[in-house]
A protein has these predicted regions:
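N-terminal "arm"/small-domain region of PLP-dependent enzymes with the aminotransferase-like
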Residues: 1-45
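PLP-dependent aminotransferase class I/II
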Residues: 29, 50, 181-259, 263-266
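Short, conserved charged micro-motifs
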Residues: 30, 280-287, 319-323
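Phosphate-binding glycine-rich loop
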Residues: 53-94, 112
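Active-site phosphate-binding strand-loop segment of PLP-dependent enzymes
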Residues: 117-169
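PLP-dependent enzyme catalytic core of the Aspartate aminotransferase-like
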Residues: 144, 291-292, 305-342
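Conserved PLP-binding catalytic core of the aspartate aminotransferase-like
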Residues: 247, 260-293
């Protein structure tokens, strides 16, 4: 559902502060840009048909065998690859999805004819899709609970794209490769704040990685994405802010929003969170912020299970966060009608 995602900055003429994307927007990528200028000549040649050199680096960094790693063009390609692979392997197959969550799990299943269940019960040849930390709620499922799911379902896909934005315990790559039915998705896009390069990877037991390779086309990951991540990982580059400071600021922003009559911001374990506005809609608020304050938020009403009143916020700098709060206060004051939250 490509038109249903956030970060639709292209729809507006002059967005100056972007709260819509969960990717950190203030990363200093200047040294990476310098490196890419040095290797730009590589675009004259085809990339590796399968990026084995980067997979070897990832395997070494994560402490797993290289045949347990598969690099993809972002975590989204991994989602569709997994759905395609299992759809072609099994005649009777269904998926369970914990809503609200990232829409691509359901979209990928629909594309390949995998029925999705309305509840979370396991059945024959079942796969559970789990976003952890979850987008859009920011909640985290414990490793112990995931292991329980692995006993209940034939396969469990754990999308850890936002793992670098939480302090909660995560399922480790070692836990995954020692299982026989867990697939773990990682997003280098999120880790290094490079969404335009589209790169991620899967960690899974070697027999599952081997199966996925059979259904993956050649040259799906471009040269610059491969070279960027090789350089970033080999040089142990970190572009995200201090996580403790970042999450403290997230909580400050959430509390400030909760002081506005008509706004209710939910708890979170990461840098983004859901909020509700009543009696107005998220679409009204989004349009006002974009056109009057050059601020972009995520209208979350298209997440299954949410309402037209839900929106999502991703923490920015303290100054930018205060500008958002002031702009929302202004919107509510202009409307001058506030609900009573129960």
């Amino acid at each position: 559902m490509t038109e249903g995602h956030g970060d639709d900055i292209y729809r507006y003429d002059d967005i100056r502060i972007n709260f819509s994307s969960n990717v950190y927007t203030h990363a200093d990528l200047s040294k990476l840009q310098d490196h890419l200028r040095e290797v730009i000549y590589l675009i004259r040649n085809y990339p590796e048909p399968e990026p084995f050199t980067l997979e070897a680096i990832i395997a070494r960094k994560q402490g797993v065998p290289a045949d347990c790693v598969l690099v993809t063009s972002g975590a989204t390609e991994a989602i569709y690859l997994i759905a395609r692979t299992f759809a072609l392997q099994q005649e009777s197959f269904s998926a369970s999805i914990l809503h609200p969550t990232f829409s691509e799990y359901e979209d990928a299943c629909r594309m390949y004819g995998i029925p999705t269940l309305s509840d979370n019960d396991a059945n024959a040849h079942s796969i559970l899709w789990l976003c952890n930390p979850n987008n859009p709620t920011g909640s985290v499922v414990s490793p112990e609970k995931i292991q329980q799911y692995a006993q209940q379902f034939d396969y469990v896909v754990v999308d850890q794209s936002y793992e670098d934005y939480t302090q909660a315990p995560m399922l480790t790559p070692q836990d995954v490769v020692s299982s026989d039915n867990i697939l773990q998705l990682h997003s280098l896009t999120k880790t290094y704040a490079i969404p335009g390069l589209r790169i991620g990877y899967i960690i899974a037991p070697s027999h599952l990685i081997g199966l996925l390779r059979q259904y993956m086309g050649p040259w799906t990951v471009n040269t610059l994405a491969i070279e960027a991540c090789k350089w970033l990982m080999e040089n142990d580059v970190r572009v995200l802010p201090d996580l403790n400071t970042y999450l403290t600021e997230t909580e400050r922003l959430r509390q400030r929003l909760n002081q506005i009559p008509g706004i209710k911001a939910a708890e979170t374990q990461t840098n983004f969170f859901l909020a509700q506005i009543k009696p107005y809609t998220a679409a009204e608020l989004k349009d006002y912020l974009a056109r009057s304050h050059h601020i972009l938020i995520r209208d979350a009403s298209n997440f299954r299970g949410l309402t037209p009143h839900h929106f999502r916020i991703s923490t920015q700098t303290s100054q930018e966060n205060d500008l958002l709060v002031n702009a929302i206060e202004e919107f509510m004051q202009r409307k001058k009608t506030f609900p009573t939250w129960e």
